[in-house]
């Protein structure tokens, strides 16, 4: 869990993923020689902070987005949401501009957002929720479990993966944008026909804590049922706890796979959280274990 704590302390509001990308690259460099297969690494300016790891001869790709929701400063103490953060008066926000570190409170006035910092903040500065990590015997609670748990899962998968792509993407929380060029690169270098999305969903009346990872049959978008049935069959065979999710809203990097010109099947597989997009996101540790285990199993057997 130590690496997860480090991941949770990195800032990466959508569009500003350079810090978390460098942290991941450093972590990969430190660990890759201890993995079962040492991957080829694709990163840098040609990939806009995204990272692609190629293990062996891939059949399947696992995607995990690096960015988070947050805020950006405008003028006269105004804030604009990045993605869809929860907004409650008094939330503690942090960031940094050219004049130094920032710690302030969110102010909600007539559906408009402001900060209370004692000086003007440079327009275009990113602010994120102050981090407060809490772990007990059953849950982890913190800001940005979405999608730090996906990144953590992907790194765990890397340890024993023999064949597959593992991709760390950007922009997901604010409409996407990196997936088209990532898919093009994959399909031009070592094409695949199937993909898994390691991301976080929400607790509902049908997906509850401690009952296993959620396998999404649909959200706003509907993946091909033939592939979903294959994933469910393998999950059943694995005996790893899982739940089936059916929703009419929400989305992920899977949307951009479905809208791409490539015939790639996809499935969202992730733990469910309470207090979505808030400083107090809460996920069952048992469900996180299931998320890691099932991604490892699926990447081996698909």
Regions found by a protein language model. Name each.
Residues 1-302:
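N-terminal hydrophobic/helix-forming segments and targeting peptides
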